[in-house]
From Swiss-Prot:
EC number: 2.1.3.15
Reaction catalysis annotation: N(6)-carboxybiotinyl-L-lysyl-[protein] + acetyl-CoA = N(6)-biotinyl-L-lysyl-[protein] + malonyl-CoA
BP terms from Gene Ontology: fatty acid biosynthetic process; malonyl-CoA biosynthetic process
Organism: Pseudomonas aeruginosa (strain ATCC 15692 / DSM 22644 / CIP 104116 / JCM 14847 / LMG 12228 / 1C / PRS 101 / PAO1)
UniProt entry tagged with the keyword Cell inner membrane: no
Cellular compartments annotated: Cytoplasm
Name recorded for this polypeptide: Acetyl-coenzyme A carboxylase carboxyl transferase subunit alpha
Activation and inhibition: Inhibited by pyrrolidine dione antibiotic moiramide B (CPD1); in vivo the effects are not seen unless the efflux MexAB-OprM system is inactive.
Any single Pfam family the record assigns to this protein: ACCA
Function: Component of the acetyl coenzyme A carboxylase (ACC) complex. First, biotin carboxylase catalyzes the carboxylation of biotin on its carrier protein (BCCP) and then the CO(2) group is transferred by the carboxyltransferase to acetyl-CoA to form malonyl-CoA.
Subunit structure: Acetyl-CoA carboxylase is a heterohexamer composed of biotin carboxyl carrier protein (AccB), biotin carboxylase (AccC) and two subunits each of ACCase subunit alpha (AccA) and ACCase subunit beta (AccD).
Residues annotated as domain CoA carboxyltransferase C-terminal: 39-293
Length: 316
């Protein structure tokens, strides 16, 4: 199976294979088969619209983890100019699972911070599969406090299975680092916009997710635990992950309905990985509009709005 397609996309993959086969035949025999190719392309588009119009929560979770899905550094390349990455937490080390630095969005200075997964095996290991250790969160905190000092808005990109649960991370204060970030972000005197671009896993996501405006891409997820983890606890088997995904309400539309997410940003047909440039432009438009709105607020009003937003979560 084509690695760019997930299991539920197999009918689309089969059609695409036929289209490619016809193109090769046409090139070899100089036959005019453009009409047949156009017919199959229309059929593929209609099939894609039908499949993606009826996705389950589990299928959306699979899309959020797609190996070709754009990561933070991809969006930084599309959205920002003059990006200068900053390293280290000034306590222990630098954590490649979180990237951050100063940049310009349409000429205006901003602080950009986000989780970063890897593509190839070596990079996946170096970035710990996007699971930060305490030094990653402390680095993020350092950059956010710097942004406040220099009056720069903060833009975060969330994409992590969760904070790294290893012994070394716990020994260095993983839970304290996350809790400290929540405290600091709740009080920062600068606008904060967070965007979930893939997986939003538990406290590992929330540690850079306290914000004035929360966006989610259409096929991203946000949850307190992975579907597999939830299924292993409730049903004693990860095979119940599809049921767990549905029960937890991990999708953007579901969370928008609960008032947790402010904006769901539509993805290109087939997902962000099908057209990263178009996806980035959609994100750019939302970020610029939201920044304009937030920067128009008095600081006291901004902080009160953030406090009210946080306190509105949960049952009354």
């Amino acid at each position: 199976m084509n690695p760019n397609f997930l299991d539920f996309e197999q009918p689309i993959a089969d059609l695409q294979a036929k289209i490619e086969e016809l193109r090769l035949v046409g090139n070899d025999n100089a036959l005019n088969i453009s009409d047949e190719i156009s017919r199959l392309q229309d059929k593929s588009k209609a099939l894609t619209e039908n499949i993606f119009g009826n996705l389950s929560s589990w299928q959306i979770a699979q899309l959020a983890r797609h190996p070709k899905r754009p990561y933070t550094l991809d969006y930084i390349g599309y959205l920002f100019s003059d990006f200068e990455e900053l390293h280290g937490d000034r306590h222990f080390a630098d954590d490649p699972a979180i990237v951050g630095g100063v940049a310009r969005l349409d000429g205006s200075p901003v602080m950009v911070i986000g989780h970063q997964k890897g593509r190839e095996v070596r990079e996946k290991v170096r970035r710990n599969f996007g699971m930060p250790r305490p030094e990653g969160y402390r680095k993020a905190c350092r950059l956010m406090e710097m942004a406040e000092r220099f009056k720069m808005p903060i833009l975060t990109f969330i994409d992590t299975p969760g904070a790294y649960p290893g012994i070394d991370a716990e020994e260095r204060g993983q839970s304290e680092a996350i809790a400290w970030n929540l405290r600091v972000m709740a009080r920062l005197k600068t606008p904060i916009i967070a965007t979930v671009i893939g997986e939003g896993g538990s406290g590992g996501a929330l540690a850079i997710g306290v914000c004035d405006q929360l966006n989610m891409l259409q096929y991203s997820t946000y949850s307190v635990i992975s579907p597999e983890g939830c299924a292993s606890i409730l049903w004693k088997t990860a095979e119940k992950a599809p049921e767990a995904a549905e029960a937890m309400g991990i999708t953007a539309e579901r969370l928008k309905g609960l008032g947790i997410v402010d904006k769901v940003i539509d993805e290109p047909l087939g997902g962000a990985h099908r057209d990263p440039a178009s996806m980035a432009e959609s994100i750019r438009g939302e970020l610029l509009a939201q920044l304009k709105m937030l920067q128009g607020l008095e600081m006291g009003e901004l902080l009160e709005r953030r406090y009210d937003r946080l306190m509105s979560y949960g049952a009354p």
